A protein has these predicted regions:
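Extended acidic/polar, glycine-enriched regions
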Residues: 101-104, 248-267
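Bacterial N-terminal signal peptides
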Residues: 9-18
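Aromatic-lined ligand-binding clefts that engage carbohydrates, nucleic acids, or primary amines
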Residues: 49-52, 56-71, 107-109, 195
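Solvent-exposed, conformationally flexible loop/turn segments
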Residues: 102, 233, 240-246
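Positively charged n-region of N-terminal signal peptides that target proteins for export
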Residues: 1-6
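Beta-strand-rich ligand-recognition modules
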Residues: 69-124
Length: 267
């Protein structure tokens, strides 16, 4: 009798879990060709759509493999996902209504995948993937083959970065500004970049959906990190870096700051 009760309770829990979970109306999208799975890879995705009116709210759920930055009309609105594993893949829910406008609107995302030599804390696959899905809103921005994708050539791994012994962090990266599609978030990049139709990858599904595996989706359980501009201080000194040389700049902050620098260069 006890065995029957246990089996019935287990069956009931599994049935409830499967009923609550579902396959999403958007799909994971990716590139048509990527570099070796051992390398850092970057791709740019975007989709533009016309809106006759601006809604009071427009909730979307967004995730990527491994990481993403999401822009609406050139404004950064989300960064993620939170650390995940394939059985518990996080997504963020974002209200993009404050960034929309009447007329043409562009959603854009840069997605990067660390490849086989990713940091130990970064789980996932070796394939770039992006997911955007409306949460009760107009599905016009749901990811599918109607999105555009551009394979990035500006970023590469620091393969000559060697640490003796065990090393669990990222290798670091190189950035070549000559190959970067400046203005891509709002379709204002220079001509000549080879944008392609995005490739549909896998169906997107909640954790607990029957007969599904890989990137099982769960809502983010921790808040987004605070991100705001802070001044580096009033420093106005000339600095000349001769060609083919290196220099170092130390900025001493009075408080702990995880800094993402904005550099303005010319030439």
């Amino acid at each position: 009798m006890n065995m029957k009760k246990s089996v019935f309770v287990l069956f009931s829990l599994c049935l409830a879990l499967s009923c609550d979970a579902s396959v999403w109306p958007a799909v994971w999208i990716g590139c048509h060709a990527e570099k070796s799975g051992a390398d850092l890879r970057v791709a740019y995705f975007r989709k533009s759509a016309q809106l006759n009116t601006v809604p009071d709210a427009h909730l979307i759920r967004v995730s990527a493999d491994n990481r993403y930055k999401l822009f609406v009309n050139g404004v950064l609105v989300s960064l993620g996902p939170a650390r995940s594993d394939l059985s518990n893949w996080n997504y963020e829910t974002v209200d993009i209504a404050p960034y929309l406008r009447q007329g043409k609107n562009t959603l854009a995302a840069v997605v990067w995948n660390y490849g086989e030599k990713r940091p130990m804390a970064q789980m996932g696959t070796n394939e770039i993937a992006l997911l955007v899905c409306a949460d009760g809103a107009d599905p016009v921005f749901n990811t599918d083959w109607n999105w555009q994708v551009l394979t990035g050539e500006s970023y590469s791994s620091l393969d000559d970065f060697v640490v003796p012994g065990y090393y669990a962090a990222d290798r670091g990266e190189r950035f070549d500004a000559n190959n970067y599609p400046w203005g891509w978030q709002t379709e204002q990049e220079a001509p000549g970049f080879d944008w392609k139709q995005a490739r549909n990858l896998d169906a997107a599904a909640d954790k607990g959906t029957r007969d599904r595996g890989g990137r099982l989706l769960v809502p983010r359980s921790i808040p987004q990190m605070e991100m705001r501009e802070v001044s580096a201080g009033d420093i106005n000194l000339p600095l000349t870096v001769a060609p083919h040389t290196r220099t170092s700049v130390l900025i001493d902050r009075d408080s702990l700051t995880n800094a993402y620098l904005h550099l303005t260069t010319s030439g």
